[in-house]
């Protein structure tokens, strides 16, 4: 019988993988319908003109054009395709 308990491994040493969130198309970049503009958790950016929002809050283009960002009331950031 062992007189000393076996040394356990550390409970640290792991991390979750990155989720590749963020802005994918920046201001004045050209987009076509269906292009993803922003991947996000929650509504950091809100959909504006010619832009839709998916169930996971992904912002995507609904028409062809160039991307523009604006700040609305109460500091809300909007994404538009014009």
UniProtKB/Swiss-Prot annotation:
<dbReference type="GO" id="GO:0005840">
    <property type="term" value="C:ribosome"/>
</dbReference>
<dbReference type="InterPro" id="IPR018261">
    <property type="entry name" value="Ribosomal_bL27_CS"/>
</dbReference>
<dbReference type="Pfam" id="PF01016">
    <property type="entry name" value="Ribosomal_L27"/>
</dbReference>
<comment type="similarity">
    <text>Belongs to the bacterial ribosomal protein bL27 family.</text>
</comment>
<feature type="region of interest" description="Disordered">
    <location>
        <begin position="1"/>
        <end position="20"/>
    </location>
</feature>
<keyword id="KW-0687">Ribonucleoprotein</keyword>
<keyword id="KW-0689">Ribosomal protein</keyword>
<dbReference type="GO" id="GO:0003735">
    <property type="term" value="F:structural constituent of ribosome"/>
</dbReference>
<dbReference type="GO" id="GO:1990904">
    <property type="term" value="C:ribonucleoprotein complex"/>
</dbReference>
<protein>
    <recommendedName>
        <fullName>Large ribosomal subunit protein bL27</fullName>
    </recommendedName>
</protein>
<dbReference type="InterPro" id="IPR001684">
    <property type="entry name" value="Ribosomal_bL27"/>
</dbReference>
<dbReference type="GO" id="GO:0006412">
    <property type="term" value="P:translation"/>
</dbReference>
């Amino acid at each position: 019988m062992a007189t000393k308990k076996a040394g356990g491994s550390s409970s640290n040493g792991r991390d979750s993988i990155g989720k590749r969130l963020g802005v994918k198309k920046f201001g004045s970049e050209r987009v076509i319908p269906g292009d993803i503009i922003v991947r996000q958790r929650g509504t950091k950016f809100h959909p504006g003109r010619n832009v839709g929002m998916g169930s996971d809050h992904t912002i995507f283009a609904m028409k062809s054009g160039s991307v523009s960002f604006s700040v609305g009331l109460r500091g809300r950031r909007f994404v538009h395709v014009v």
